[in-house]
């Protein structure tokens, strides 16, 4: 991918001639507080640095097209980062509806108390925007959009960008509509998984929020995520525990351990 190297930004090690991937950390790679142009933007960018969100660009290197995943706080900066790397953003996907993954109008219940740019930016660009069907209505309200401006996703659905497919795995627990995305190239190879707030290295997303479910998370982790290939790279929604892991590593020492029973899981989460 010489066109990526020509930008002065090194491509991610998982990139090759056909597969494009880039990880962005909020407050460091985008939404950088020192780059804020207004006091309100500085507040947003300071929150971004505090929350340590990972955002992702995934797509087809040959077509030079990618999907933005969980692009919030500075969606224009995410689009600019993709363009700097030689790719055009053609769609956006959210792994779940929480404000730090889709943005917020600053008024709806459960927000940060200020407007946050996010999915609405991609709607205004005329791009398709995807979220799990169970969270579509509340997400639309949260970002002051019409429901028909969002596209629903369900378990097993795929979003294509060039020859790359992002397959949806519904993983309720952190939220009712949380999803994991598996990137698959046209040779059928599963290249990586984006786990949102379902799996972090050594842990999982919070289960004390409205709509969270301890039992649903256990089922998602032990029956869906743990069933994936041990070698599959895993990239989380926040820098809580590190930038990446693998399914096998989480089965050995994380919350995918097969020794965790439902009873022991409930006790762990009740602490």
Where are the regions that the model predicts?
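Metallo-beta-lactamase
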Residues: 64, 158, 165, 170, ...
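Binuclear metal-dependent hydrolase catalytic cores
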Residues: 2-19, 23, 105-111, 126-127, ...
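Active-site HxH/HxHxD metal-binding segment of metal-dependent hydrolases
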Residues: 51-52, 66, 73-165, 184
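Generic structural signal for helix capping and beta-alpha/helix-loop junctions
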Residues: 31, 99, 138-139, 242-244
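Structural detector of well-ordered beta-strand residues that form the stable sheet scaffold
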Residues: 21, 68, 90, 130, ...
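Short Gly/Pro-enriched turn/cap motifs at secondary-structure boundaries
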Residues: 46-48, 150, 170-172
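Conserved S/T- and glycine-rich ATP-binding loop of Class I adenylate-forming
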Residues: 58, 95, 171
């Amino acid at each position: 991918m010489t066109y990526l190297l020509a930008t002065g930004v090194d491509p991610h090690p998982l990139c090759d001639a056909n597969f494009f991937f880039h990880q962005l950390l909020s407050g460091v790679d985008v939404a950088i507080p020192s780059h804020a142009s207004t006091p309100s933007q500085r507040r947003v960018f300071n929150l971004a640095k505090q929350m340590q969100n990972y955002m992702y660009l995934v797509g087809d290197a040959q077509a030079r097209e990618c999907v933005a995943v969980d692009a919030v706080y500075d969606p224009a900066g995410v689009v600019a980062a993709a363009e700097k790397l030689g790719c055009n953003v053609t769609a956006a996907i959210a792994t779940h509806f929480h404000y730090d993954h889709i943005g917020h109008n600053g008024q709806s219940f459960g927000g940060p108390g200020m407007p946050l740019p996010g999915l609405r930016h991609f709607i205004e660009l005329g791009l398709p925007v995807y979220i799990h069907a169970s969270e579509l209505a509340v997400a639309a309200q949260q970002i002051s959009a019409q429901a028909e401006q969002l596209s629903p996703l369900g378990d097993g659905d795929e979003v294509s960008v060039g020859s790359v497919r992002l397959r949806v795995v519904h993983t309720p627990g952190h939220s009712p509509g949380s999803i994991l995305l598996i990137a698959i190239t046209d040779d059928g190879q599963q290249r990586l998984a984006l786990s949102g707030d379902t799996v972090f290295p050594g842990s999982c997303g919070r289960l004390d929020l409205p709509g969270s479910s301890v039992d649903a998370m256990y089922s998602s982790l032990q029956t869906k995520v743990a069933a994936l290939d041990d070698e599959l790279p895993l990239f989380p929604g926040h820098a809580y525990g590190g930038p990446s892991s693998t399914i096998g590593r989480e089965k050995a020492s994380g919350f995918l351990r097969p020794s965790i029973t439902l009873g022991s899981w409930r006790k762990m989460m009740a602490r």
